[in-house]
């Protein structure tokens, strides 16, 4: 439905980094600004995505000035109420439609995954094509990571309706409506989709960062 068979897609789509979580297990605040290896989680994510994507934007509510050091567009949720990551995805799709009108695809990732694979975009694109899907989702250890995904920009109308009319908030529940591709990554020497949700996770990430070759 969204051109899933096309091989002519641009190799570097826009990306939205989702930083709107409440970080309750870390005591609140901006999880994206927590430090790992002397850098913020957000800086590490940007480093992983910069060479893979045409442009990066940040999905976050509140005062955008707190992210001024990163020189990224900061986009608030386009719907009222805290509706979770799907609202951030919609914010990104709307932003891409306005600022990158030629783009057909958008990558989404959370801001708390500091070791994202450097072939993320390429492998998601290939999985989408090979499996003739509308959406491509990352997976590891037999588990999908729904917010690490490649989305068709044209899906934004359906997504807005799902959020506002159907009150759908779970990413899996929404994407189950469409053909989905899964791209699986190995978890050795470490899971590239490790995410930092707790202070203990941050401590573990410090150790992983010391062993990361790149």
UniProtKB/Swiss-Prot annotation:
GO terms for biological process: bis(molybdopterin guanine dinucleotide)molybdenum biosynthetic process. It holds the Pfam family NTP_transf_3. The keyword Flavoprotein does not apply. GO terms for molecular function: GTP binding; metal ion binding; molybdenum cofactor guanylyltransferase activity. It catalyses: Mo-molybdopterin + GTP + H(+) = Mo-molybdopterin guanine dinucleotide + diphosphate. It is an enzyme of class 2 (transferase). GO terms for cellular component: cytoplasm. Mg(2+) binds at residue 112. GTP binds at residues 18-20, 31, 77, 112. Keywords: Cytoplasm, GTP-binding, Magnesium, Metal-binding, Molybdenum cofactor biosynthesis, Nucleotide-binding, Transferase. Its cofactor is Mg(2+). It is found in: Cytoplasm. InterPro entries: MobA-like_NTP_Trfase (IPR025877), Molybde_CF_guanTrfase (IPR013482), Nucleotide-diphossugar_trans (IPR029044). Its main location: cytoplasm. The keyword Cytoplasm applies. Its EC number is 2.7.7.77. Belongs to the MobA family. Transfers a GMP moiety from GTP to Mo-molybdopterin (Mo-MPT) cofactor (Moco or molybdenum cofactor) to form Mo-molybdopterin guanine dinucleotide (Mo-MGD) cofactor. HAMAP family: MobA. Monomer. NCBIfam families: molyb_mobA. The N-terminal domain determines nucleotide recognition and specific binding, while the C-terminal domain determines the specific binding to the target protein. This is Molybdenum cofactor guanylyltransferase. It comes from Rhodopseudomonas palustris (strain HaA2). The gene is mobA.
């Amino acid at each position: 439905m969204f051109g899933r068979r096309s091989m002519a897609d641009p190799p570097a789509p826009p990306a939205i980094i989702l930083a709107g979580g409440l970080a309750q297990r870390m005591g609140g605040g901006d999880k994206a600004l927590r430090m790992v290896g002397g850098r913020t989680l957000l800086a590490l994510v940007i480093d992983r995505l910069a060479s893979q994507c045409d442009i990066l934007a940040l999905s976050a509510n509140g005062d955008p000035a707190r992210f001024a050091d990163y020189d990224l567009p900061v986009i608030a949720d386009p719907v009222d109420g805290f509706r979770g990551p799907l609202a951030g995805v919609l914010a990104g799709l709307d932003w891409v439609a306005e600022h990158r009108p030629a783009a057909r695809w958008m990558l989404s990732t959370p801001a708390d995954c500091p070791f994202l694979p450097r072939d993320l975009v390429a492998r998601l694109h290939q999985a989408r094509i090979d499996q003739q899907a509308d959406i491509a989702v990352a997976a590891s250890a037999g588990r999908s990571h729904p917010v690490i995904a490649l989305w068709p920009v044209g899906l934004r109308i359906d997504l807005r309706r799902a959020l506002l009319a159907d009150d759908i908030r779970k990413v899996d529940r929404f994407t189950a409506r469409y053909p989905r591709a899964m791209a699986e990554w190995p978890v050795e020497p470490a899971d590239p989709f490790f995410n930092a949700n707790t202070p203990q996770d941050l401590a573990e990430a410090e150790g992983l960062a010391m062993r990361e070759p790149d």
